[in-house]
Structures are given as structure tokens and as C-alpha cells.
A protein has these predicted regions:
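Alpha-helical transmembrane segments
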Residues: 29-33, 57-62
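N-terminal membrane-targeting/pre-transmembrane regions
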Residues: 1-42, 162-171
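Hydrophobic residues embedded in beta-strands of well-ordered beta-sheets
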Residues: 81, 107-109, 165-166
Length: 171
């Protein structure tokens, strides 16, 4: 979290890039295998090119997600919020926030902030555990505090429960 006069800047925890590397390595191995089969004149099952293309798209999707995570910033200011993630830049005043939905899950809370013409979402901190050992963390470490500040500054009140989730809106 970075603080400047009148603003608090938050960035999410970053997940390991190991999954991205594995996706690209398996895509490369599939392409190499496909190429070897083609060059040697052997019959290539239709599943091989499908698998190679699927792995390439998987690598691209994971890379895009990691790129966006590394550029994600949420700024809480006196006049409202700013959310950036590399692809989008959203500025929303406190008065323009019409609703905040909170959906608890095994991976932390997913918080969705709705304005008159815009929307963004973020996750509170989540820990990935394997055999009770923390293997990774993602989401905003101060996510619960960010949610509390959004609710207080925007003047929203809890409205009703939606299954396991709940939301805040103006009454």
C-alpha cells in the first residue's frame, strides 16, 4: 500500500509465475512433437494440433492474467476510487457508486463495485494451502479494509442476502 496526501494506493498480492512457465513449456513441447511427427511423415492425430493450439491459448490467457495482476492498482481518494489493471482505467466518485456485491468463496471474497456506467471487481486476500501449508497468496491483502472504506465513503447500507453473498446499496 502506498500513501500520498489524500490517497491510499493498494496493489494485490502476486501469484507465482510457475503456472505460466509450465503452460508455455507444455505448449512448446506439443509444437515440437507435432513438428517431429510432420517432418518424419507419420500420421498426425487431429488431437495433436488441437492440443497444441489449446496449450498456446492457455499460455496466452495465463500470461495476460499475470500481466494484468502486475499492473493492478486500486486508489482510494477523498473524491472516489480509481481502479487500473493494464487494460482498464476506471474513476468513480463516491456518489456514483450504486451497489457493492460481496460473494464469499473458498478463494476469499469477490467484491463487485457497480457505478452508473461502470463496474470493476477485486478479491480480498486468499491463501492457497496444500496439506495445511501455504503455497501461495493472491488478492488484496487489505481487501477487507478496502471494502469497509468503500461502504463508508459511498454511504451504502446492507440491503439483503443473496444465498451466501450479500450486497450494499442506497436505500
Amino acid at each position: 500500500m502506498l500513501n500520498t496526501p489524500g490517497k491510499q494506493e493498494y496493489t494485490p498480492q502476486l501469484i507465482s509465475r510457475r503456472g505460466e512457465a509450465i503452460a508455455w513449456i507444455t505448449a512448446l513441447l506439443a509444437i515440437i512433437g507435432w513438428s517431429i511427427l510432420m517432418v518424419s511423415g507419420r500420421a498426425v492425430s487431429p488431437a495433436v494440433p488441437f492440443l497444441a493450439v489449446f496449450l498456446i491459448f492457455s499460455g496466452m490467457a495465463i500470461s495476460l492474467g499475470n500481466w494484468m495482476d502486475r499492473r493492478t492498482v486500486l486508489v482510494i481518494g477523498e473524491d472516489g476510487l480509481e481502479f487500473r489493471n493494464g487494460l482498464r482505467r476506471i474513476n468513480i466518485s463516491w456518489q456514483d457508486i450504486s451497489e457493492v456485491r460481496v460473494n464469499p468463496s473458498q478463494w476469499g471474497k469477490k467484491v463487485q463495485v457497480y457505478g452508473q456506467r461502470t463496474y470493476f471487481s477485486f478479491r480480498t486476500l486468499s491463501e492457497v494451502k496444500v496439506q495445511n501449508e501455504i503455497k501461495g497468496r493472491f488478492g488484496f491483502e487489505q481487501g477487507d479494509d478496502i471494502l469497509r472504506q468503500i461502504i463508508l465513503h459511498s454511504g451504502l447500507e446492507i440491503v439483503e442476502r443473496q444465498g451466501e453473498g450479500y450486497y450494499y446499496a442506497r436505500k
